[in-house]
Amino acid sequence: MAEVKVEVASIDWQKRCLSLETQLFRFRLQASKIRELLADKMQELEQRLLEAEQRAENAETQVGVMEEKIKLSNLKSVDSTGTLHQKYQELLRAVQGKDELISQLQAQLEKQKQTRAEEAKIVQEKAAKIKEWVTVKLAELEMENQQLKTCNQQLVEQVAALQDALEDLRMTPSEELLVVPEGTPERDPVPSGPSDQPVEQDSNPHTQILKVAVPTPSLGTLQSRDSLSEARSLEDLRFSMVHPGETAEAKTLQSHLQKEGSPSQLCMKPGNPKHGSASYRESLVTAQGGTFPGTKTSAREGGPGSSLTLPKVRAPSIPRDSFQVAKRHHSQPQVGPGHCDHVVSIEIGALSALHSPGSSKSEARAKVREEAEKMEMEALPPSGKQEERESLKSRRGELEDVELENKPPTPPLHRFPSWESRIYAMATSGMQLSEVSSRRSNAACYASGPSALAFPGAFSGLVYKNVTVPVYTALKGKATQISNVPFVDESSGSDDDCGSQASFRMSVPCSEYRKTSGLGSPRAIKRGVSMSSLSSEGDYAIPPDACSLDSDYSEPEHKLQRTSSYSTDGEALEKSGYLLKMGSRVKTWKRRWFVLRQGQILYYKSPSDVIRKPQGQVDLNSHCQIVREEEAQTFQLISGNKTYYLTAESPSLLEEWIRVLQSLLKVQVTGPPALHQGGTKPTVKGWLTKVKHGHSKLVWCALVGKTFYYYRSHEDKRPLGCLPVQDAHIEEVDRSCDSDEDYEAGGTGRLLSSHCTLVIHPPEHSPTYLLIGTKHEKDTWLYHLTVAAGGSNAKVGTVYEQLIGKLMDGEGNPDSPLWRHPMLCYSQEGLCASLTTLPSEALQTEALKLFKSCQLFINVPVEAASVDYHVSLAQTALQVCLVHPELQSEIYCQLMKQISCRPPQKYSLMQCWQLLALCAPLFLPQHHFLWYVKQQLQRHADPRSETGQYAIYCQRAVERTLQTGEREARPSRMEVVSILLRNPFHHSLPFSIPVHFANGTYQVVGFDGSSTVDEFLQRLNQETGMRKPSQSGFALFTDDPSGRDLEHCLQGRVKICDAISKWEQTLKELHPGKSEGGTRVVKLMYKNRLYFRSQVKGETERERLLLAFQASGEIVAGRFPVTKELALEMAALMAQVEYGDLEKPTLPGPGGTPPTKAQHLLQQVLDRFYPRRYRNGAPPEQLRHLADMMATKWAALQGCSPPECIRIYLTVARKWPLFGAKLFAAQPAQLSPKENTVVWIAVNEDGVSILDHRTMQVNITYPYSSVTTFGGCRDDFMLVIRSIPDQSSGKTRIDKLTFRMPAPKITETTLMMASYMNHCSATVNLSAKLPAARQPRDLDGQFFASVSCTKGSALL
């Protein structure tokens, strides 16, 4: 045992363990190898098994075929009569018949399914219509019931008051009835002058009710003057007892109505307690007479909508009769003033619901909605009325019993929580600014004002590339752009506008229709007045000042024919007729009689003035130009330094005038480039001398596709002519040709001794000679003309171009040895000459420099730390190609050369592909080069390799560029870095950028190098669950690179990459000394730009949330009027949405401090959601008190969900009539800059409003129907207004308003107004196309007479 123990002790167990582990490891290696071998063997056996099974199946199939063949051969030999074949044919026909039957049954089944689906859809539509009708009907009945209750209550009170008056009448002598009680506050009486004088009111019009009974004598009612005076005495008594403080005013009002002779019409003008409206109105008016559209005036006497009386009713004897009468009120038509007694019951607070003819229907609908909300949130009656009702109970017990028996059941009302009702009640009078100290208010005022009036930066010119500040006019209710540059007062001729004064408001009285003369008067027919000359010939209407029937417009038109065309010769062609001309100072349309005669255009006020001196004259010579925008209903006649904006009364007359002027000037109308369609751009262009039939002319030439165009100048967009090049014979000729000698003898002598000559000889046409200045230009034109003609001249062009031509002739045969030609493949050495034909030696030098830049980009490895080196190289090279389009094909050829047959050096080849990936979204090469690039990309496309994936990415980029067009700016740093440091082929959208929202969140959206803003927003809306911008009104904005508080709206056709690049470029120009990388990046914001009330029903939750946060931002910035109390309530709602329920603060310890977390949160809420003007300069005690009140308001919202808070917030905010409007700070141009008077210009769906900058009270509102012209005028914003015709004088006023604003704000204001006008026009046209039964019922028509259509203009 001892020996065994010694042996065991002598064993080294550690070495033993290591040896065993080594053996185990070797065993595992052997086992893994065995498993691998076994797996390979099994896989091989399985593959062999599959192959064997496949062979067996093939063999079985062959055996079956052979057996069938043997059977057929046997059957044919046995049955020689062919009965089997006949049976086979019968079976085949049966199978075909079955198939046809099955197909017929399937078609019937599909038809039945479609029919069932259509029937179900029709049923659903009918159900929806029925539901909508029932809802509208219930709302109407509920409103009618509410008003009937109110009317019944008022009638009961009147009966009770009359009973009391009768009782007092028996006890009081008649001499004491008209004595005014002592203590009655005196009021200014209403003057008995014109009917539109204002009636003084109390400062709180919502709590007063003016009840006036005005009896009018009619047959069967009052038979004598005594009865009339008695009724008046009773009414005076009743009125003095119910409202003793208003007795004198009511008496004066009655006497005033009696003097006017129309007691059924009451013209009132609610007084504004704020002095801003009156003073602003007085400062604007420069001439007497006429009313301004949009002003808060009542309906004039005799005008539509001015009757405030109830229809004829019989005197009720009991309350039951009065209830029946009131119930019958809405179904009876209104009768004239001389047929019945009228009882006028007017609520002064609701006087604004009565619209003048110039007011818009949308305001009336808003008032109806407010009334509906008031009925929903109806609280208990005021205590004063309750006490009055209690005092009358004892005197009318029987009447109340009768009333209770006949009173309908009270409809169920939706009752809001107490705190919500309190917010709504506060909102009814809280849409105004609270008073603050003058120092604080001025600080807040100028904090929001001057920043908006700052001078614009350089970025605005880049974002709005061609459109600096446009000018729009209203034609047929639509906003039509007539100029893309601001107006200059003298640019349009001033011969007919000498009487106007260039000031802030210029007024031009215009005559309206004479009431004594009509279109059908015998005098007009006798004098030969044409109907078409006095009214519109097409679907246009004539402006009010253009359709006057004064004597000077009634001359016979046979004196000078309306349209006379005697010859096609320029000097002999004559024409005359009416055109609408834009005035030079007051930018509005004026109807003038134009005469085209002897190469001149003369215009007069009327045809009768042709014997006098013309108001203007235009000489039509070779310097004249006709400009017409695409699909525009206006055109510009440019002569020298003057531009005449003209339009006709119908599209046919407009086309006729343009055609005549075009024939006279022997040029086509200049407009947008119609020949560059589908992304096609000129292959080569330049100044050439064209010689044909011995006549030479220096023209601007461009080769587009296979057509040669020539223009008068490089600025023209319509050619003088064109020449087809397809199959033409192109060659260079010596200078001994006749046309050359004739040209030199002509003395033009510009290219006398060094020019080259090319001839273009199309089939079946005479040859045309081109005289070219230099050899480089000649080579370029010769090569591109030869390629366009389809020639195969091997000696034309460079060697590279000749090889591409040969490949095209071989249709890109992949086995052609030309693909491996040394000229087409990679070369390590630099180029000695350009690969393409270039028109000048300077461009050839640039091509060689471009190749060196590409070589540096390709051969230097890209590192993340020094990526800016490659960014600068790529941007510089591509910027050169954008500046010189001739080099765009050159850089593609250079990159294709360096990619083809390149040695396998990974990073160099990848960087070459990356540079190509940067080129593809920017621009494309021309024609045959583009074909060659596509062939090369197809040859390299391979999803298994990295270079092949780059080729596939470049293919997609080329196709996208062909679809969406080329870019305008070089790639941005973000774009270059994304291509260099990320693999773009792994993503369908290789770039991404965050889009910020008003609530502080953001959404990352992907895009590619060709994505437009419309495509970008479509992806954004899909990811966020929002509607398209045409419905939601949202738009994409960028911040300003200068850091100022400016935002720039991006148009839908702009490309995202271009906007980012221009932003970065502007930032570098503003900070040239900083590093290339920089720390700032562009910030994209998605905000509401246009607000449409008709689209409110379809709002999504996300839209409502963003709209609430945007409104909160406007409140904080001081661009939304709310009182301090209402601002606190709304800030608490936003705090509940943003942070949830307010946590109860924990009590501090014995030696602790009060909780600072809650205080910090409250301070943060006040900073984010409470108006700055109410916080700035406030003492600390007031701020602490404000925080305590905020905590109380916030705690009351415990448990309220964010969607519920958003609903309440928007309901409150929408009580401001200008909710959704965009406010722009501006300064009236008639004031000197030292005065520093700033106003708000509010642009909304209904029109343009001018607001006081300090109080935000509306001074005046101009509906879009009164706006004729708007946009830039020099450096200011111009607004031309046509007022409503005055009914007494029949004249209108043309007012031109100008405001000082920054150029970006002017552009944004103009574009926003145009968007609103076109949207309103489209909505009106859509509703007009609907059947009458489907049109929504206008609630305004239930109470007021509809506004009748005026005889004004539909054109303006």
UniProtKB/Swiss-Prot annotation:
The modification Phosphoserine is found at S451, S739. Residues 826-980 form the MyTH4 domain. SMART domains: B41, MyTH4, PH. GO terms for cellular component: cytoskeleton. CDD domains: FERM_B-lobe, FERM_C-lobe_PLEKHH1_PLEKHH2, PH1_PLEKHH1_PLEKHH2. It comes from the Eukaryota. Residues 179-203, 256-314, 354-414 are annotated as: Disordered. Pfam families: FERM_M, MyTH4, PH, RA_2. Residues 27-172, 359-407 form a coiled coil. The keyword Coiled coil applies. Residues 991-1327 form the FERM domain. Keywords: Coiled coil, Phosphoprotein, Repeat. The keyword Coiled coil applies. Residues 572-666, 681-790 form the PH domain. This is Pleckstrin homology domain-containing family H member 1. It comes from Mus musculus.
